A protein has these predicted regions:
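Cofactor-/ligand-binding subdomain signature composed of acidic, glycine-rich
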Residues: 1-34, 38-41, 140-143, 149-172
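Cofactor-pocket helix-loop regions in the catalytic cores of large enzyme subunits
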Residues: 20, 24-34, 48-49, 173-206
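Alpha-helical scaffold segments in soluble metabolic enzymes
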Residues: 7, 11-14, 18-21, 58, ...
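A general structural motif
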Residues: 180-188, 228-238, 253-254
Length: 341
């Protein structure tokens, strides 16, 4: 097991409880920041990488749905210094040590530097002179579980409250919903693992706010089950990508066009798992997994729960040890204490 992390199943075992505690802390912190006027003005730009970038998808969707311009950007995909603008820049990093995210924040006007991190103190928290929203240094697995779900919660609550918005009451019930869904769906979802036994790849496809769920799911399948996987939006998938279907499994998140995509793929002889709130009849190749209808960020947390359950079972079927990572890159994380920080 990688130093500084707990086992995947250990993190999952206490996830519902830890998520509930984090939501309570985050709601209080965001409410206080809003009362101080710190969450007003132009919409936030969230920069992150990997799972942290995926976590910002549904919250950005929620902000745009309220008419607030907001973006999520890959921290390593832009020349530095980051262009000056009126929008606050939030570095999103569960460890607080992502090198690319730190580099972006370092290049931004100090008054516009903010962070959403799990670990405080950390280098990213230190340079975020505008403000830090901390998750509470929650113990997490190397292939992130509670760190990811709590990050989505933090960003979702922040999005709700931005510029005079109201934090959705459903957040106070989400941990209980999470636990109930986990109990109900675990046997059903684990039973789908044999679909991946001989799969050469996996496609994860999501409707607009669920693109982050598709991306995070593909990352988990690469990390935990070592299956080449890709996450993308439904609309992108329709523009040519689904033409290479064959030999893999298709996991689709959504309630509208996604139903037709799932039926089309299954009708053409491909294995499909459809994560949806709509009632869908199962077929020989179409396997619906029903989840509650929730606001975008809350729904994203339930969607990734389905993936967490599924990928662990798939790793078992394929004989992959969850805790064993193949590559450890030395330049993607900075030291916990770096010179000058």
């Amino acid at each position: 097991m990688t130093d500084g992390y707990i086992a995947y199943e250990a993190a999952r075992a206490t996830q519902a409880q830890a998520l509930g505690a984090a939501i309570t802390r985050l709601t209080g912190a965001v409410t206080a920041s809003a009362a101080e006027g710190a969450l007003s003005g132009p919409g936030p730009v969230f920069v992150g990488i990997g799972a942290s970038l995926a976590a910002a998808c549904a919250p950005v969707w929620a902000l745009r749905g309220r008419g607030i311009h907001s973006w999520r950007l890959g921290a390593g995909d832009h020349p530095l210094p980051f262009p000056a603008a009126a929008h606050p820049v939030f570095g999103v990093s569960q460890s607080g040590r992502s090198a690319e995210t730190l580099a972006v924040l370092d290049s931004v006007d100090p008054a516009r530097r903010f962070a959403v991190v799990n670990v405080v103190p950390s280098p990213i928290a230190t340079v975020a002179t505008g403000g830090v929203l901390g998750l509470g240094s929650i113990p997490d697995s190397y292939a992130s579980t509670i760190g990811y779900t709590a990050t989505v919660a933090a960003l979702g609550i922040l999005a709700d409250a931005w510029d005079g918005g109201r934090i959705d009451e459903g957040w106070s019930r989400l941990a209980a919903v999470f636990a109930a869904v986990e109990s109900e769906l675990t046997p059903r979802v684990r039973a789908l693992a044999p679909l991946f036994e001989g799969a050469t790849h996996a496609d994860f496809v999501g409707t607009g706010p669920a693109v982050g769920s598709a991306e995070a799911s593909a990352l988990l399948f690469r990390e935990v089950a070592r299956i080449p996987s890709t996450g993308m939006s439904t609309r992108q998938y329709l523009h040519g990508s689904m033409e290479s279907a064959g030999g893999g499994v298709h996991v689709i998140f959504g309630d509208t066009r996604e139903l037709d995509v799932a039926e089309t793929l299954a009708g053409a002889g491909h294995r499909v798992i459809l994560v949806t709130s709509e009632p869908v009849a199962a077929g020989p190749l179409l396997h619906p997994v029903t989840v509650p209808r929730l606001p975008a960020a809350q729904r994203a947390i339930i969607e990734i729960l389905v993936t967490q359950i599924l990928v662990a079972a798939v790793a078992e079927v394929r004989g992959v040890e969850v805790e064993e990572f193949v590559f450890h890159n030395s330049d993607i994380k900075v030291a916990a204490e770096r010179p000058g920080v």
